[in-house]
């Protein structure tokens, strides 16, 4: 599972996702990629499930790059506990994403095979996505 090795603070404020992605919004490594169309938070399990879906479809050929990393802790209080008495314990990690963010890139396989793999991966994600192809292909 993806999670930071060390963090300065165990808990973080929730915050709000506003605006479009400035960084990580263009294809850097591969030929075809998944790009987000809305705000959302991807858990480490969702990121891994989409990666596995891509790898199983393209089999041995090609390379896959994961362009997001879950570095924001998520907290939760136990079931049947009254409100108050402080913030809950950390239970997992998420990667906050804005519209326009590239999530996965693929290179080294046929474009149609890569497109189908990315479509399968997009079904594992909680945000609307689109498939983008690098200029000149």
UniProtKB/Swiss-Prot annotation:
SUPFAM superfamilies: Ribosomal protein L16p/L10e. The keyword Secreted does not apply. One of its GO terms (molecular function) is structural constituent of ribosome. CDD domains: Ribosomal_L16_L10e (cd01433). Pfam families: Ribosomal_L16. One of its GO terms (cellular component) is cytosolic large ribosomal subunit. Disulfide bonds: none annotated. Keywords: Ribonucleoprotein, Ribosomal protein, RNA-binding, rRNA-binding, tRNA-binding. GO terms for biological process: translation. Residues 1-21 have a biased composition (Basic residues). Residues 1-22 are annotated as: Disordered. Belongs to the universal ribosomal protein uL16 family. Part of the 50S ribosomal subunit. HAMAP family: Ribosomal_uL16. PANTHER family: 50S/60S RIBOSOMAL PROTEIN L16 (PTHR12220), LARGE RIBOSOMAL SUBUNIT PROTEIN UL16M (PTHR12220:SF13). Binds 23S rRNA and is also seen to make contacts with the A and possibly P site tRNAs. NCBIfam families: rplP_bact. This is Large ribosomal subunit protein uL16. The lineage of its organism: Bacteria, Pseudomonadati, Thermodesulfobacteriota, Desulfovibrionia, Desulfovibrionales. The gene is rplP.
């Amino acid at each position: 599972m993806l999670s930071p090795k060390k963090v300065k603070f165990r808990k973080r404020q929730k915050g709000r996702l506003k605006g479009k992605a400035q960084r990580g919004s263009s294809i850097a490594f591969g030929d075809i990629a998944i790009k987000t169309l809305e705000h959302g938070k991807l858990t480490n399990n969702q990121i891994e499930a989409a990666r596995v879906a891509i790898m199983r479809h393209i089999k041995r050929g090609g390379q896959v790059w994961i362009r997001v990393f879950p570095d924001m802790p998520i907290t939760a209080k136990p079931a049947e506990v009254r409100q108050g008495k402080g913030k809950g314990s950390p239970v997992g990690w998420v990667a906050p994403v804005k519209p326009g963010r590239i999530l996965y890139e693929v290179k080294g396989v046929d474009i149609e095979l890569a497109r189908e793999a990315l479509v399968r991966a997009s079904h594992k994600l909680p945000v609307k996505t689109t498939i983008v192809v690098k200029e000149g292909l």
